[in-house]
Amino acid sequence: MADSYTLGIDCGGSKVMAQSVTYNSITGLVSPGDFQLEVNYSDSPKWNSKFIPVHLDLQRQEFSEGNIYLTQPEMDQGDVIVETIQDIISKSESDSIGLCFPGIKNDRGVVIMANGPRIPDLLERIQGIDSILHDSDCCVLGEWKSTIGKLQNCDNALYIGGGTGIADGIILMGKMIDFNSRDDVKRSWELKMPSGETIESCLSPKGMIEQWNLSQREKVKTLDQLSKNKNADTIFEKAAEAFLFLIQNRARFFKANHAKIEKIVIGQRLGIFMADSKLISLLESNTDIPLDYSTDRRTAALGAAWKRICS
C-alpha cells in the first residue's frame, strides 16, 4: 500500500539527480515515482569546468578557526549549484524534500568540500529543506531501503560508490554506521595507501581519469575511453590495489566489532563501468566476499527521500 510521496535530490560533484518516490508503510521501503530529472551543472553558462577547490588543509584550518573565507570562484560555482537545485524543486512542485550533498556539513551548510565549492549557507538558500543529508549515507540507504536496492535484507555489508569521489557505506549488525561519530573507521578520502595516495584518488573514476590525463597527451573524459588504452592497465591495477587495501581495512573493522562482511555492493559510475569491464576480474580475484554491482544512478536520491520520510 503506497501511502506517502516525497522527492529525493542527490547533489553530486557534476550534476543533480532528482527522483520522486512512493513509500510503503508495511514494508518500510520506497519505490521510484513518476518524476525524475537529471541536470548537469555544466548546462549553466556560468559553470566553471576548470574550478579548483581550496586546498583541504586550508579548508580545515578555516573551519576549525570559525572563519571560512570563500574565494570568488567558490561563490560563483556555489551559485550555479544552488540555482540548479532551486530550479529542480520548482519543476517538481514537491513540498516534501530530502536533499543529500557531498563534503563535511554543519547545521547550516557545506563547510569542507574536496571536489567542489564550499557553500556554508546552503540550508538558508534552499526553501523546503530543513537538513542536508550525507551523500554516502543516502547511497547506502537507497540500496538498503528501496525496492530497487542491492542491499535489501543485509545485516553486515559494505557499499563503495565511485564518481567524483568515493561514497563509503557500512551496515553493521543491521544498522548503518555514522562515520562522523566513530574514531575507529575512516572514509576513503582519509585512508592513505603505503604509496601515500588516498584510496579515493586511486579508485574513484575521477581519480583514475586524472592520473591518465596528467601523464598522457591524449586526454580522456570517461572510464570507457580510458579502458581502450593499453597503457592504462597500470591505472586499473592501482585501482585494484586500492580496492584490496580498502576491503582489508573494512574487514579488520568488522572483525573488531565481532561481525563479518556478507556482501559488497559497488555503485554509482564505478559500478556502472565495472559491471561490464575487465576491472571485475582484477577485483574479484582479490576477495572471496560476494560482490554485486549497482548500475542505477537514482539510489542516492531514493535514499534521501527515504530518510526524509522516516526521520
Tell where the protein language model's regions lie, with residue ranges:
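Glycine/GP-enriched mid-protein hinge/lid loop-to-helix segment characteristic of carbohydrate kinases
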Residues: Y5, M17-Q59, G128-L133, S146-T234, ...
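Residue-level signal for short, function-critical loop segments
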Residues: G103, G163, L270
